[in-house]
């Protein structure tokens, strides 16, 4: 936590080479990882100590662990989600709003912020509103094709909007720019695939795994078995399903590496000929950066169907195939895999299309937007 200090009015805008950046939001990795990338870029543009950053989130989101691990200051506010809630849960979360706004106001009084950057999630709403009331210019970041609830609300009061996709920027109008999504440099370093046997498939449902994907793959193994000598599968299962999935591969004598969690995902992307995965904004951006062919299986319950819209954008660009979870059967999954296994040229075409969507300068462009507001 940052110590209290009131050195200047909270709305005073400093020069672009100085000042403290407020980064607000969090909850999931899709919120936190862009926040960390922007924080590092903001701090790294000036000598050490010339700039500072304060990240504001909640005690329950991934930011509570990831931000301190990154060595960055985290402050928290009392706030919870409203969209999709009902009954007593909605009433409880509504009752928390005054506390969240009060916490936000106290943070604004403690610091002299040059600008604010909202990454979506519960904490972004109260903090970006507080920034507006204190006349601190703000940029909000929307990585998905379909904007989230918080960002749809905040777009009207923010100064600028940075978007992961051009069609989203068009939707927000003149204040928006398509910057792309910040992705670690390791993903861009992936070499072009050679697609020689064994055909390497990476399967992942995210760090916690995805039961529907794990179950569909297990049920597909008998159908894949006639060509198992052509395949090598790396499968990230999550902790819950690890043993069941590992045993399923072993019983059928597949060449496979089954792990509960993958530490260096960029390295695994680089080794894969095909990736079977969810289609959250960060994952989609990583697939594009690595230039890999993918079969996207969107999380069906994702808010506003944003994963489906992300996957549709990639499929429409020729960079991926979309397999809706409602259509995820062993037969369909096997058919999609064999179709690409038999068409290495098609995989190469998908890879080329994916690379065209990658935005290696995304984090630089976002910080340029922020600095532009500070200079005004």
Predicted regions and their residues:
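Conserved nucleotide-sugar phosphate-binding/catalytic loop shared by glycosyltransferases and other
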Residues: 18-26, 44, 49-99, 239-241, ...
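A short, well-ordered alpha-helix in the C-terminal region of glycosyltransferases
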Residues: 346-360
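Donor-nucleotide binding loops and adjacent catalytic segments primarily
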Residues: 16, 49, 61, 66-70, ...
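Active-site-proximal region of nucleotide-activated glycan assembly enzymes
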Residues: 62, 132-192
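C-terminal alpha-helical cap of glycosyltransferases
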Residues: 3-4, 359-376
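Glycosyltransferases and closely related glycan-assembly transferases
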Residues: 103-117, 123-139, 152-156
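Acidic donor-binding loop of glycosyltransferase active sites
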Residues: 113-115, 270-285, 292-293
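C-terminal "capping" alpha-helix adjacent to the active site of nucleotide-linked donor transferases
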Residues: 321-324, 328-345
């Amino acid at each position: 936590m940052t110590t209290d200090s009131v050195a200047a009015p909270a709305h005073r805008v400093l020069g672009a080479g100085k000042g403290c950046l407020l980064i607000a939001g969090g909850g999931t990795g899709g919120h936190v990882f862009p926040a960390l990338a922007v924080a590092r870029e903001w701090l790294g543009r000036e000598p050490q100590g010339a700039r500072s950053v304060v990240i504001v989130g909640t005690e329950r989101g991934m930011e509570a662990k990831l931000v301190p691990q990154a060595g960055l200051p985290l402050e928290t506010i009392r706030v919870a989600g409203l969209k999709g809630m009902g009954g007593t849960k909605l009433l409880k979360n509504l009752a928390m709003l005054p506390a969240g706004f009060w916490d936000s106001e106290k943070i604004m009084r403690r610091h002299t912020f040059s600008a604010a950057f909202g990454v979506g999630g519960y904490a972004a709403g109260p903090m970006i509103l507080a920034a507006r009331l204190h006349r601190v210019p703000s940029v909000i970041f929307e990585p998905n094709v379909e904007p989230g609830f918080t960002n749809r609300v905040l777009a009207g009061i923010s100064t600028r909007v940075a978007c992961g996709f051009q069609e989203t920027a068009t939707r927000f109008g003149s204040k928006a720019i398509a910057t792309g999504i910040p992705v670690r440099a390791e993903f861009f370093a992936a070499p072009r695939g050679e697609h020689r046997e064994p055909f390497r498939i990476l399967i992942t449902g995210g760090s916690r795994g995805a039961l529907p994907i794990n179950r569909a793959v297990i049920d597909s193994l008998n159908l894949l078995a006639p060509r198992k000598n052509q395949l090598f599968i790396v499968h990230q299962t999550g902790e819950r399903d690890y043993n069941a999935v590992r045993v399923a591969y072993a019983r059928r004598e597949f060449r496979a590496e089954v792990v509960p969690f993958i530490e260096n995902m960029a390295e695994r992307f680089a080794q894969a000929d095909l990736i079977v995965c969810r289609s959250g904004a960060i994952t989609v951006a990583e697939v594009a950066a690595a230039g890999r062919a993918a079969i996207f299986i969107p999380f069906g319950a994702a808010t506003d169907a944003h994963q489906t819209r992300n996957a549709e954008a990639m499929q429409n660009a020729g960079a991926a195939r979309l397999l809706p979870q409602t259509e995820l059967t062993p037969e369909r999954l096997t058919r999609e895999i064999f179709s690409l296994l038999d068409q290495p040229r098609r995989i190469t075409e998908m890879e080329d299309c994916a690379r065209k969507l990658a935005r290696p300068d995304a984090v630089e462009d976002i910080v340029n937007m922020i600095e532009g507001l500070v200079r005004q």
